[in-house]
Amino acid sequence: MSAQVSLELHHRISQFLFHEASLLDDWKFRDWLAQLDEEICYTMRTTVNAQTRDRRKGVQPPTTWIFNDTKDQLERRIARLETGMAWAEEPPSRTRHLISNCQISETDIPNVFAVRVNYLLYRAQKERDETFYVGTRFDKVRRLEDDNWRLLERDIVLDQAVITSHNLSVLF
């Protein structure tokens, strides 16, 4: 990572991420979309368990995309949720996004910052369905001229190699 940012800038970016998480928890998806850059790259790959000897050699097992979404694809996912016909979300999930260990650094691009956070996403649905998603997110955020922020990239890395939930319809 490049140079760390000032405490004030760290606070501003952290507050942006906390606000973004609350929008998802409150099902304010249109407001959440407004926080995304037009060029957003929103990705999650499968997690593959690699042998220690392979990791030492730098051998990475092949992975598959779980999501590799653009803003248009995220808008379509949200439009589907809004129809009431997304059966995976009937009744709607109750989520809680927790983020911690926020590390923020400058990038080579002016006003773009690299963010690494650990996250825990708790999802409850119906009476007894509960799921925990735990991992690391690698985000890039862009500061706009009016001192607002936009999410430019999000790469979600799950710690779980096997996803035990019935579906993966929540947003990270």
Curated annotation (Swiss-Prot):
GO biological process: 3-phenylpropionate catabolic process
CDD domains cross-referenced by the UniProt entry: ring_hydroxylating_dioxygenases_beta (cd00667)
Recorded metabolic or biological pathway in which this protein acts: Aromatic compound metabolism; 3-phenylpropanoate degradation
Keyword Oxidoreductase: yes
Pfam families listed in its UniProt record: Ring_hydroxyl_B (PF00866)
EC number annotated for this UniProt entry: 1.14.12.19
Subunit structure of this chain's protein: This dioxygenase system consists of four proteins: the two subunits of the hydroxylase component (HcaE and HcaF), a ferredoxin (HcaC) and a ferredoxin reductase (HcaD).
HAMAP family hit by this protein: HcaF (MF_01649)
Protein name: 3-phenylpropionate/cinnamic acid dioxygenase subunit beta
Species whose genome carries this gene: Escherichia coli O157:H7
